[in-house]
Amino acid sequence: MLGNTTLMTLPKVGFLSSRKVPPAAVMKCYDWATEMRDRGVCVMGGFQSPLERDVLTFLLQGKQPVIWVLARKLWTPRGVPKAYRAAIEEGRLLIVSPVSQSIRRVDAQSAAVRNRFVLEHSDRHVFGSLDPNGQLAKMLEGVSQDQIQVLG
């Protein structure tokens, strides 16, 4: 783990998205990210897809806590991209990796481990989009519907 490990003890909203996102959902995701940022809500996500990366950018413009879950090995402290170092130093960003530290590139298996980690460690789940036939939807079997929100 890199960053403030006490963030794991906070109430968290998990954000994930299917790869295919309807254009109408994009602005809803940006608005949601802005609202979470302004309300100071701790958001946990993989932030891998372009939409998820945009959401991370919106979130890091605020001061609320963010937990970034990688599906690959962690960076070394020096290897963390400069855009994220200030948030780590300020104690509002935690970067974790629940996968083997030998994994250098994300694959379907490591992405599934990451997504399961986000779902298991967040109190509510928000999806930018959710393909009913996709892997994310399959992971939600047995999860209470009142814990799930789909934006698009």
Which residues make up each language-model segment?
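Glycine-biased, small-residue-rich flexible motifs in mid-sequence functional cores and linkers
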Residues: 1-152
